[in-house]
Amino acid sequence: MKATDIILFFAAALVSYLVSGLNPAIILSRAIYHKDIRTCGSGNPGFTNFKRSFGGRYAWFVFLLDIAKGAVLFLAFGLLFRHFRGEWATGVAVSAVFAMLGHAFPVWYSFRGGKGFLVCLTASWFLDWRAGLVGTAVMTVLLLTVRLMSLATMCGMALSAGVLWLLFALTDFGWLPAALFSLCVLFMILRHHENIVRLCHGTEKKFYIFGKPKDKGSK
């Protein structure tokens, strides 16, 4: 491995971890409501709990900022890896792995972060639009029917990973980005362990895209 490769991988790891650790849900809950989202509802500092705890007025800013944060990282390192190594997808996948770690264990907030579904969702689109499209479509259908955010995100992202492996089998898509994204999805699912228990017991709270339910949600 050349020195430029080492620098590139190190930069992707460090920058993605630090930038992804900046959590819009925590920042906005403190700035607007003078509360830490981690003390509200389920305690998860993410879009779902923010919307349940404070309503939808600012929740969509959390959603868009989380996506924008990932998009900037994945675009930057996709372009850098393509320029120096000719590997767009590898750059995106490496960035995604450390973005997941930064989102889940942020150094800025005592290593208490979120579950990372928006990191996975954004990465899926940058890895291959077909993976992003399938994952987003499945998530949307499940949200509009069963209204279980945790189930929708896990199923959607698992299918996105499946699409990447299918592309690996049928096209020149690399095995490494497919494997790294699959690790991200597995990590995200493990972060949903409490939700999985509630799903099995039939006690998982519903999530409504529209409307402002403010109960103590489960995500």
Where in the sequence are the language-model features?
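Short, non-helical or kinked segments that cap or interrupt transmembrane helices
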Residues: D36-G46, V107-L121, L148-G156
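Helix-coil boundary and interhelical linker segments in multi-pass alpha-helical membrane proteins
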Residues: M1-A11, F74-V94, W125-A131, L166-L180
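Loop-to-transmembrane alpha-helix initiation sites
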Residues: L133-G135, M149-M157, D172-S182
